Amino acid sequence: MAKAKFERSKPHVNIGTIGHVDHGKTTLTAAITTVLAQKGGASATKYDEIDKAPEEKERGITINTSHVEYETANRHYAHVDCPGHADYVKNMITGAAQMDGAILVVSAADGPMPQTREHILLASRVGVQYIVVFLNKADQVDDPELIELVEMEVRELLNEYGFPGDDTPIVVGSALEVLENQDNAEKTKCIDELMEAIDSYIPTPERATDQPFLMPVEDVFTITGRGTVATGRVERGVLHTGDEVELIGMKQEVSKTVCTGIEMFRKILDEAMAGDNIGALLRGIQRDEIQRGQVLAKPGSVTPHKKFVGQVYVLKKEEGGRHTPFFNGYRPQFYFRTTDVTGSINLPEGVEMVMPGDHIDMAVELITPVAMHENLRFAIREGGRTVGSGVVTTISE
């Protein structure tokens, strides 16, 4: 068969498998690629190839993740699977592999377990809004009522963490049976059902270019006779020459200006879009009124804040993190986008200290405001070395 050309015509969605250890996340990943390979939508990836996930470094944290890709009739998917529980925690908090939706794998024989709960909680904290459930190992359960019971438990658990449990698609099957009976349409039907549920239930994410414009300021310089230029990489949205923008962060007040010119690689552009590295010429802004760490953004789209609650993973000693615990009132630097800001932390009630390797919710108060929104990632640093990684879960003020 001639190789098909990769078509960009299909919308792209990032998903991943989550759930308790040994409930069959990796087996399911292998089963999906195997079934879709027969339709020409993937190359079959064996369990062992997925399980020996390569180590990746994301912000200095070692995470094992496996990436596979496949497509259905409607979409192209990038799918991430992590071998160990700690890898999931790190992956979800650092956003190393962004997930637009997740497949929660629960063993029908065992029902929800501690990590099932923990992964649902993490998904809700880090902004994974859509979950589709696969009840695996159904071949090990003789009584259909038991499967219904597990289904009810899973729906209740999803409701508990703010997901619409009653409306969540749940597909029942056995990933191992699929792998052992690849040519038996009856046995592989559960994968077709799962992919249909994912196609219809997890919406196509809004592309970065459709979101409101935002660019973190990396550097500032003056062009004699023309004015002040801010450089940086456009994080989201589109900027046109003549657009009004706000300058936000590092001080309480927000200043407004107009972008009078855009340059990229010394060429003049009419518009810049997400992903472009640009210089933006700003009308009426003095060199000392703008600094690294601020952002340029569409007016009204983002606001500066000092207080927030974050979900944080604290690096282990082996990952280059601290060797000792920290306590209430700890004052490290919080690195948002392009700059460090000092902040003090408040631990949850009943938590005396935080050990390297822990993940925890903490309340933070920064000394200067930063342009922030929920789900924004940050690093915690001490003297320039990363000791933690986090995501903003709620903004306090």
Curated annotation (Swiss-Prot):
<dbReference type="GO" id="GO:0003924">
    <property type="term" value="F:GTPase activity"/>
</dbReference>
<dbReference type="InterPro" id="IPR004541">
    <property type="entry name" value="Transl_elong_EFTu/EF1A_bac/org"/>
</dbReference>
<protein>
    <recommendedName>
        <fullName>Elongation factor Tu</fullName>
        <ecNumber>3.6.5.3</ecNumber>
    </recommendedName>
</protein>
<dbReference type="InterPro" id="IPR005225">
    <property type="entry name" value="Small_GTP-bd"/>
</dbReference>
<keyword id="KW-0547">Nucleotide-binding</keyword>
<dbReference type="InterPro" id="IPR050055">
    <property type="entry name" value="EF-Tu_GTPase"/>
</dbReference>
<dbReference type="InterPro" id="IPR004161">
    <property type="entry name" value="EFTu-like_2"/>
</dbReference>
<keyword id="KW-0479">Metal-binding</keyword>
<dbReference type="GO" id="GO:0005737">
    <property type="term" value="C:cytoplasm"/>
</dbReference>
<dbReference type="GO" id="GO:0003746">
    <property type="term" value="F:translation elongation factor activity"/>
</dbReference>
<comment type="function">
    <text>GTP hydrolase that promotes the GTP-dependent binding of aminoacyl-tRNA to the A-site of ribosomes during protein biosynthesis.</text>
</comment>
<keyword id="KW-0963">Cytoplasm</keyword>
<keyword id="KW-0648">Protein biosynthesis</keyword>
<dbReference type="InterPro" id="IPR033720">
    <property type="entry name" value="EFTU_2"/>
</dbReference>
<feature type="region of interest" description="G5">
    <location>
        <begin position="174"/>
        <end position="176"/>
    </location>
</feature>
<feature type="region of interest" description="G4">
    <location>
        <begin position="136"/>
        <end position="139"/>
    </location>
</feature>
<comment type="subunit">
    <text>Monomer.</text>
</comment>
<keyword id="KW-0460">Magnesium</keyword>
<dbReference type="InterPro" id="IPR004160">
    <property type="entry name" value="Transl_elong_EFTu/EF1A_C"/>
</dbReference>
<feature type="binding site">
    <location>
        <begin position="19"/>
        <end position="26"/>
    </location>
    <ligand>
        <name>GTP</name>
    </ligand>
</feature>
<feature type="binding site">
    <location>
        <position position="26"/>
    </location>
    <ligand>
        <name>Mg(2+)</name>
    </ligand>
</feature>
<dbReference type="InterPro" id="IPR009000">
    <property type="entry name" value="Transl_B-barrel_sf"/>
</dbReference>
<comment type="similarity">
    <text>Belongs to the TRAFAC class translation factor GTPase superfamily. Classic translation factor GTPase family. EF-Tu/EF-1A subfamily.</text>
</comment>
<keyword id="KW-0342">GTP-binding</keyword>
<dbReference type="GO" id="GO:0006790">
    <property type="term" value="P:sulfur compound metabolic process"/>
</dbReference>
<dbReference type="InterPro" id="IPR009001">
    <property type="entry name" value="Transl_elong_EF1A/Init_IF2_C"/>
</dbReference>
<dbReference type="InterPro" id="IPR031157">
    <property type="entry name" value="G_TR_CS"/>
</dbReference>
<feature type="binding site">
    <location>
        <begin position="81"/>
        <end position="85"/>
    </location>
    <ligand>
        <name>GTP</name>
    </ligand>
</feature>
<dbReference type="Pfam" id="PF03144">
    <property type="entry name" value="GTP_EFTU_D2"/>
</dbReference>
<dbReference type="Pfam" id="PF00009">
    <property type="entry name" value="GTP_EFTU"/>
</dbReference>
<dbReference type="GO" id="GO:0005525">
    <property type="term" value="F:GTP binding"/>
</dbReference>
<feature type="region of interest" description="G1">
    <location>
        <begin position="19"/>
        <end position="26"/>
    </location>
</feature>
<feature type="region of interest" description="G2">
    <location>
        <begin position="60"/>
        <end position="64"/>
    </location>
</feature>
<dbReference type="InterPro" id="IPR027417">
    <property type="entry name" value="P-loop_NTPase"/>
</dbReference>
<keyword id="KW-0251">Elongation factor</keyword>
<feature type="domain" description="tr-type G">
    <location>
        <begin position="10"/>
        <end position="206"/>
    </location>
</feature>
<keyword id="KW-0378">Hydrolase</keyword>
<dbReference type="Pfam" id="PF03143">
    <property type="entry name" value="GTP_EFTU_D3"/>
</dbReference>
<dbReference type="InterPro" id="IPR000795">
    <property type="entry name" value="T_Tr_GTP-bd_dom"/>
</dbReference>
<dbReference type="InterPro" id="IPR041709">
    <property type="entry name" value="EF-Tu_GTP-bd"/>
</dbReference>
<feature type="region of interest" description="G3">
    <location>
        <begin position="81"/>
        <end position="84"/>
    </location>
</feature>
<feature type="binding site">
    <location>
        <begin position="136"/>
        <end position="139"/>
    </location>
    <ligand>
        <name>GTP</name>
    </ligand>
</feature>
